[in-house]
A protein has these predicted regions:
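Boundary/linker segments flanking structured domains
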Residues: 1-69, 73-211
Length: 211
């Protein structure tokens, strides 16, 4: 008589395993104040923006958590054509662009922080998707438009983004303003509380990161 038996399956290079490793290593990188004037550095990679202050009531619940408000990547190759990007400093450039956006919107730079990690595009893509899926950062999930670029008349004719509706001030022009600011504020408030409740559920979370 045979005994039912099936060995466990293990794939050390599975997408989920690689994603968790990338996210864990990323979260061991230091938080860098957005006020820091960074010298240019080369390379592409993964980055996130964190709020650790108290003056913006909307984001104040995040101050004791290393929970990003925005996650993105800066690539070395165009995903459509496969050609290399013109800049040799795409990660630095993207972080500098976001710093200007935060400043132009009148938000306190001293209360925002960067975290970044240089890596190949394929791994940055995995990390970006993993962090966004896990944390659902407010500027990715609710207040879309933060990372967009203004590009000529087509963009100027488009609707004002949700992010710019809440954080007005960037030197851009828009064709319409369709979003209700009060409704967006309520959505963000509820969303942040929900994400804080799930803060320790992520597979790569390390103990003791909330300070």
């Amino acid at each position: 008589m045979t005994t039912p038996y099936e060995p466990n399956y293990f794939d050390p290079l599975s997408t989920d395993r690689l994603t968790n490793i990338i996210c864990e290593v990323f979260e061991h990188q230091p938080l860098v104040p957005m006020t820091l004037e960074m010298e240019k550095f080369g390379g592409s990679g993964l980055y996130a923006i964190y709020y650790r202050g108290a003056s913006i009531e909307l984001y104040a619940p995040l101050k004791n958590y290393e929970m990003p408000v925005y996650v993105g990547q800066a690539v070395s190759n165009n995903s459509t054509t496969g050609k290399g990007v013109k800049s040799r400093t795409p990660l630095h450039g993207r972080m500098s662009q976001h710093r200007r956006s935060v400043s132009d919107a009148g938000l306190p730079l001293s209360e925002f922080f960067f975290r970044a990690l240089r890596m190949p595009d394929v791994h940055a893509n995995l990390g970006e998707k993993g962090l966004i899926r896990g944390y659902r950062p407010a500027w990715n999930a609710i207040l879309s438009g933060f990372g967009s670029n203004e590009q000529g008349s087509a963009t100027r004719a488009s609707a004002k983004s949700k992010w710019d509706t809440i954080h007005d001030g960037r030197k851009r022009t828009y064709g319409s303003e369709p979003h209700d600011r009060a409704k967006l504020v309520t959505e963000v408030e509820q969303h942040i509380l929900e994400r804080i409740a799930a803060y320790d559920d992520l597979p790569w979370r390390r103990a003791g990161t909330n300070v």
